[in-house]
Amino acid sequence: MGLVTCKQEREAELQNRQIDTQIRIENQANKRKIKMLLLGVTDSGKSTIVKQMRVNYLDGFNETEVVNAIFVIRNNIIDAFKNICNIILHSDITVTQEEKVLVKLFAYESGKIELMQEVDELNVINAVSGYECIKQFFERFAFHPMVPDHIHYFYPNLDRIASSNYVPTAEDLIHMRQTTLGVHEISFDYTKHIIRLIDVGGQKTERRKWIHFFEGVTAVMFVCSLASFNQTTEEEPKAFVWESSLNKVQNKVLVRSAGKAKVEKPGLINRLDESVDLFKSIRENSFLKMSNFMLFLNKKDLLTKKLTKVVFSDYFPDYKKWITNDNSDVSVAEFIENMFREGLEPEKRMYAHLTQATVTANIEGTFALCCDVIFGKNYEDTNLE
Ligand SMILES: Nc1nc2c(ncn2[C@@H]2O[C@H](COP(=O)(O)OP(=O)(O)O)[C@@H](O)[C@H]2O)c(=O)[nH]1
Ligand SMILES: [Mg+2]
């Protein structure tokens, strides 16, 4: 009898020990898992950062994605020319009688181009891109707010892209614009950790979903396009609902940044202002109070180019009062960073980085700096890196 009890006790103890070991292994695995969220308004560069992580830490792009990119990139170009031709027709740029046919086709009936046979589609893209009116457009209005950012990369590469044997390069895929719908996650090993990086759609209609991913977030990477200072938000008044729902949770009223932009038409919101407001409402969110906040002030290359043609204080008059208001990229970036910091409670730390998400090495380096903070290495409270 005694022996039986002894055996049962030993078996129970063994079982307990096995369960303990299992729990310890699971806890350790969970500790290795780091959840990171990419947030920001649409077109800021979130998905581009995910692409760079895939290039750096996973297998990059597969064959299907590369083939699919041929069509997405050509549609990106058709959409860009649609806007460009529209602006041309409403400007003082001379359009010859011969040019008018295709310029009007792109401006008003671009859907028809997407339905053409590939050879015809390439013919019209090649023809229109060589027009004098298009060249003039790029000389005078390249940084018009209606011109998508990717065209600054695709236009000089059109000879290659609009040819029948085109195979997109990794760089082409990084510059390609594809709106994110829904929520996407990638997972990769980084030092001793497993990073779960979550990418969301930035459109107003998509933002309602964000709050469902706020639990257990180690770091928020908030991405803002520095080049968005002369752009407006997508106009979807209905979708403003999300902001009230997000703020209801934390019981706070959304505060607008002090130096906000001058807006030409009533009802329009400056995209940089929108980004700052969105950042502040997220930074204050109680679910994220334990998270590290990394601000990616992105598209620094486009900011530099844009400032050669556009005067920042025309959009943000408060910049005239800034210490160095020389319209240089450095001073404008500092002003923008300050817009994000203004009004933040001092204990709410934030690490800001100037980035160019289209450059693989730049994102690799910035991500390493962010991880130094997250994993607790020594780190000075940063200003722009
Ligand atoms: N020139 C330039 N283009 C960028 C940069 N970051 C992103 N883009 C481009 O901006 C567009 C929108 O980027 P995407 O990552 O889709 O934005 P999301 O809506 O925030 O996910 C794409 O065409 C990108 O290639 C950058 O630093 N410089
Ligand atoms: Mg995206």
UniProtKB/Swiss-Prot annotation:
Residues 172-180 are annotated as: G2 motif. GO terms for molecular function: G protein-coupled receptor binding; G-protein beta/gamma-subunit complex binding; GTP binding; GTPase activity; metal ion binding. Residues 294-301 are annotated as: G4 motif. GTP binds at residues 40-47, 174-180, 199-203, 298-301, 357. InterPro entries: Gprotein_alpha_su, GproteinA_insert, P-loop_NTPase. Residues 195-204 are annotated as: G3 motif. GO terms for biological process: adenylate cyclase-modulating G protein-coupled receptor signaling pathway. Residues 35-48 are annotated as: G1 motif. Residues 32-385 form the G-alpha domain. Residues 355-360 are annotated as: G5 motif. Mg(2+) binds at S47, T180. A lipid is attached at C6 (S-palmitoyl cysteine). A lipid is attached at G2 (N-myristoyl glycine). Keywords: GTP-binding, Lipoprotein, Magnesium, Metal-binding, Myristate, Nucleotide-binding, Palmitate, Transducer. One of its GO terms (cellular component) is heterotrimeric G-protein complex. It comes from the Eukaryota. Guanine nucleotide-binding proteins (G proteins) are involved as modulators or transducers in various transmembrane signaling systems. G proteins are composed of 3 units; alpha, beta and gamma. The alpha chain contains the guanine nucleotide binding site. Belongs to the G-alpha family. This is Guanine nucleotide-binding protein alpha-5 subunit. The gene is gpa-5.
